[in-house]
Amino acid sequence: MTQSVHANRDAALKSIIGKKVQQAASELTIFAVKFDDETGVIFDAVQPSSPTVAARLVSAAELPNLAEAVCSVDWSWIYGCTIDEANAGSSSVRLKLSSVGPLTIGTGLWEGKPFLSFQPFRPAKK
């Protein structure tokens, strides 16, 4: 299962390079990004053998509604950015966003369940 998670993630990461972020939302285990071409990507915290970030490309209509998430983050600071690079680590994904720099999506465990973490979780001070 781990190999398929990584293969799907790698394919999704390749396909989002050059796309422009229109909206984004997150909750504890999901980060959903909508692009200006009516596609999106969903990053999930999963635990096939150890916590990792899964990713899949979807149509914008398939993106979850995370507007009322308990642990919501204001992602407006990445709106309008283009994804210049998208790289996978063993348990994380690093996106290089035009004009704001890198965003790392990591995973961890809380009470045996995986969750997502973000660095930075807000824009850097200029």
Describe each model-derived feature in a short phrase.
Residues T2-K126:
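Surface-exposed, interaction-prone regions used to assemble/regulate multi-protein complexes
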